[in-house]
């Protein structure tokens, strides 16, 4: 398989997200580090693999399903790197994981995920995140044992897909969504897409979560309130988190709330 490798040195300042209890177990990271990029073709899907240059063997892999491979790190001074404008590309330096971002469409057959995982022999754990689509929900229904945890950022699931599939096994899932999102509606669109609370609630029900906890992150001056509903108590050990951001946009990557840090904090506990 043809690969094109790029290594960039970037001086990055990372904002660390605030935990729901207003405390953090990490400190901001400032320094020089390197990312490696590999351009791949996975079952006719374009993909970019991003990872720290010195990543440990067997480190976790986060597979991201996105309709556009906009992956250029904003801090990258190197024009020759792949088109990587996706904040998670930089966050993998904090989390110490490999990131495999695959170009997809909302109606794709997800069988290619098996080929994607085969690129990382010896990997300890795989996680799946869908970005601006609901494919992680589809995967959680069709292949609940394939990933240690699932996540979704600003995505929605088609009504017909929801009706023709079922959540059959407990899964751990995290979803982040702006309540006023104009593209992927929080409450769904009648006969087209399913509401975010319904999707999250369906997983919590299959997990048989017996309790939930609601918390707010630190206030964000001039920005929408960020709250977290955590469904837990399942005998399976699987839990569900829903981060809701008031307003029409997330304002994800500010000092008070860095979305991919929250997602990784969830993933790494599973």
Predicted segments with their positions:
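Active-site nucleophile loop of the alpha/beta-hydrolase fold
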Residues: 104, 151-159, 178-182
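Active-site machinery of serine-nucleophile hydrolases
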Residues: 59-62, 67-119, 226-231, 236-245
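Hydrophobic h-region of N-terminal signal peptides that target proteins for export
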Residues: 10-17
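Sec-dependent signal peptide recognition
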Residues: 2-9
């Amino acid at each position: 398989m043809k690969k094109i490798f790029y290594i960039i040195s970037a001086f990055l300042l990372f904002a660390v997200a605030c935990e729901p209890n207003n405390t953090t177990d990490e400190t901001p990271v400032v320094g020089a580090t390197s990312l490696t990029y590999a351009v791949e073709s996975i079952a006719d899907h374009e993909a970019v693999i991003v990872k720290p240059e010195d990543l440990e063997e067997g480190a976790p892999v986060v597979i991201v399903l996105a309709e556009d491979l906009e992956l250029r790190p904003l801090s990258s001074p190197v024009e020759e790197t792949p088109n990587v404008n996706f904040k998670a590309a930089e966050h993998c330096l904090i989390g110490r994981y490999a990131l495999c971002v695959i170009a997809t469409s909302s109606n794709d057959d997800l069988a290619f995920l098996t080929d994607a995982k085969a690129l990382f022999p010896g990997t300890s754990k795989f996680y799946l995140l869908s970005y601006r689509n609901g494919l992680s929900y589809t995967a959680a229904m069709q292949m609940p044992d394939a990933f240690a945890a699932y996540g979704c950022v600003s995505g929605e699931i088609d009504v017909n897909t929801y009706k023709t599939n079922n959540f059959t096994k407990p899964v751990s899932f995290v979803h982040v969504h702006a309540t006023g999102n104009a593209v992927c509606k929080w409450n769904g669109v009648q006969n087209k897409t399913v509401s975010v609370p319904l999707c999250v609630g369906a997983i919590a029900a299959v997990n048989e979560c017996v309790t939930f906890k609601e918390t707010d992150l630190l206030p964000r001056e001039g920005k929408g309130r960020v709250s977290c509903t955590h469904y837990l108590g399942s005998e399976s050990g699987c839990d569900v988190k829903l981060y809701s951001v008031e307003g029409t946009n997330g304002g994800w990557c500010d000092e008070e709330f860095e979305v991919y840090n929250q997602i990784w904090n969830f993933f790494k506990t599973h």
